[in-house]
Amino acid sequence: MRASETPRPSRSLMALLPKLVVNDQGQPDFDASDSTVLVSLAEAAELLQRILQLGISAVGQLLAHASVQVEVGEFDQDTVEALGWLLAELGDAAAACVELAAPCRRATADVTGRGHG
C-alpha cells in the first residue's frame, strides 16, 4: 500500500470534528448533527482506536525485549520514561476515540441499522 493510500484517521477526525454541532453549553449535540458526519466520525475514531492499541502493544513488546538493554544502561532511563508517558497518552487517546464513537453510533443507529453496545 502506498503512503497516499494509507488511512489517516487522526487527520479525518481533525477535519470532521468542527462539523459536529455543539449545544449552548459547548457540548456535542449528536442528535442535531448530520448523520453522515457522525458515521464518518465513528469510523475514523474506531479505526484510530485500533491503530493506537496495536501500536501500544507493539511498543510494549519492544520494551519487554529491550529490558536487558535498559538494565545494563544501554538505554537512557529518560528514554524509557518518555516512552511510558507516550504510552499513557496514546492509551488515553484510544479511550477518547471509543468515547466519541459510541454516541455517534447511538445517534445514527436508526439511519445505519448499526447500534452500539
Predicted regions and their residues:
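Sequence/structural signature of long amphipathic alpha-helices
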Residues: M1-G117
